[in-house]
Amino acid sequence: MESTNLKNAKHETLVMDPISFQSKAQEVSRFSENSNPNFVSHSTPLEKSSKSSAQKNPKWKPNPVPAVFSPRNRIRERRFVVVKKNSRKEKNDSASVDCKCGAKTISNMKKCVCIAYETLRASQEEFFNNRRESVSEIGESSQNLEDGNEQVEFGDSDETRVSLMKRRREKVLEEARMSIPEFGKVMHLVKAFEKLTCFPLSKVTSKEEEDQIKQPLKWELPGMSQPKCSESETDQFTWSSSFYPSSGLILTATNLGLEQPHASVSSSWDNSVSSLNSNGGRRGRRNSFESSASMGSRRSTKKQIKVTSLKPFKLRTEERGRMKEEEFAKKLHEMTLEKAKKRIPIAQGLPWTTDEPENLVKPHVKDITIPVDLKLHSDIRAVERAEFDYQVTEKINLVEQYKTERERQQKLAEEEEIRRLRKELVPKAQPMPYFDRPFIPKRSNKHPTVPRDPKFNIPQHKKIRCCSTSSWSDTGSYMSDLLYQQDL
C-alpha cells in the first residue's frame, strides 16, 4: 500500500477548485510580490531535500535544464550592483562563497562574477521557496474545501448547500451592481444573469465536462519544458503559466556563461523540482493514510463540483426584434424593386390593324327626363296655418292702434299742462299790509304736553332696580306738573 501511495504521490498534480481559484491566485501573487529577492540565505531547505533524494537514489540524476545559450562576453559586460554591507558581513560572505575565477583579493572579490551569480541564485531560491509555501497552503485549503464539500454532499445538508449558492449569487450581484456602466445597461444585466446561471444547480452534466474536470491541471514546473497542449486546453488553462516565468528568464550558470550546459553543478531550479516532488510525495502519503483511516469508502464516492454547461441566453424580445427586422428588410427590398420597375419607361404599343372594320357596340341612350312639380311641405303647412296667421296680424294691428292713440292723448295732456303753467307764472302785485292793527298772537287753551318714558322690554332680573328709578321719575313728573299749573 505504501509503495503504491508513494508512486501516486510522485505523479500527483495539483487539482484546483475552479470556484475558489481566484482568491487563492490573489494570495499567491501577494506572497510573491512581497517577498524580498535580495535577501541571501546560505542554507535552504531545497538543498537539503535535493541531497537527501540524491543519497536515497544513487542512480538519480538531475534533469538537464533547457538553458538559453549566451556568450560569456555579454555576462562579463554586465555590471552587478552589490549593496554596501558591514565589514563583518562582507568577510563572512567572502568566506562562504568560493571564487572560481582566482580573484581572491578584496578589491577583486567585489567585482567577481562568480560571487554575483551565487548571490543571485540564493535570492532566487528564496523567492521560489516562498512561492512553494504559498502553493502548499493553497493545496491544503483546496483539500479542506473538498472535505467540506464531501460533508455537505453526504450529510443531510441541502439547506447549507442552498445557502452557499445564495451567498455566491449575492456576491456576483453586488459586483454587477457596483460595475454598472452609464451606457449599455441592458447588455450588462444580461451578462450578470448569465453569470448567475453559471453556478451548478443540478448534479446532471455531460460526460465530456466530467472528463475535463477529472483531468488534473498541468502545473508548469520551474525549469521544465512546457508540454504541447491543444488549443482548447491552452484556452482553459492559460492562467497557469502566469505563476512561473518563461525559460528565457531563468538565471543559471550556463545562462551566465560560467559553466558548460552539461556541467555537474545543479541550479536552483533542479533543487526546486526535487523538493516539489519530495513534498508532493509526503503530502500524498499523509493524505492516503488519513483517508484510509478516517474517511474509509467516502473517498471512492467523492464527487467533484461540476461546471455547468453554458447555454445561449435567449429572450423573447430579441426574437421579436429579429422578426421585425426581417419584415422591415423585406419591405425595404420590395419597395426598392418597385421603384426600380417604375423608373423603367414602358413603351405604348401600336394599334392592332385588321382587314375588317370593328363595329363597336353603342352605349345605351337614356330617355329624356320629365320634370315633376315640387311639392314643398312648407306650402302645405302654410295653408293649414292661414287662419292663425290672420289672427296674429289682427292683434298686431290693434296693438299698433292702441299705441298711436296713447301717444296722441299724452301729447294733448302735455300741451294743456304747459298752458296752465304759463297762466300761473304771470306775476301779480301783493296787497299792502295794515300797520294800524298789529297782529298779537293769543295764548292757547291747551295744556302743554307731558313727556313720558318709552316702554322698553325690561328683563326680570332688572325689574326691581328699574321700578325704583321709575317711581322716583313719576313723582318728579307729577311735581313738575303741579308747579306748572300754579304758575298759570
Swiss-Prot record:
Subcellular location(s) of the protein: Cytoplasm, Cytoskeleton
One term of GO molecular function: microtubule binding
Main location per the UniProt record: cytoplasm
Effect of deleting the gene: Reduced hypocotyls length in light conditions and in response to ethylene due to reduced cell elongation and associated with the disruption of cortical microtubules. Suppressed effects of submergence on hypocotyl elongation and cortical microtubule reorganization.
Low complexity bias locations: 264-280
Annotated keywords: Cytoplasm, Cytoskeleton, Developmental protein, Microtubule
Spans annotated as Disordered: 25-71, 262-304, 436-457
Composition bias, Polar residues: 25-56
InterPro entries from the UniProt entry: TPX2_C, TPX2_fam
Induction record: Induced by ethylene (ACC) via PIF3 binding to its promoter and subsequent transcription regulation. Accumulates upon submergence through ethylene signaling. Repressed by aminoethoxyvinyl-Gly (AVG), an inhibitor of ethylene biosynthesis. Higher levels in light-grown hypocotyls.
Keyword Cytoplasm (UniProt): yes
Domain of life, source organism: Eukaryota
Any one Gene Ontology BP term: microtubule depolymerization
GO cellular component, one term: cytoplasm
Reported function: Binds directly to microtubules. Microtubule-destabilizing protein involved in the PIF3-dependent positive regulation of hypocotyl cell elongation via the modulation of cortical microtubules dynamic in response to light and ethylene signaling. Promotes submergence-induced and ethylene-dependent underwater hypocotyl elongation.
Family: Belongs to the TPX2 family.
Listed name of the protein: Microtubule-destabilizing protein 60
Annotated organism of origin: Arabidopsis thaliana (Mouse-ear cress)
Name of encoding gene: MDP60
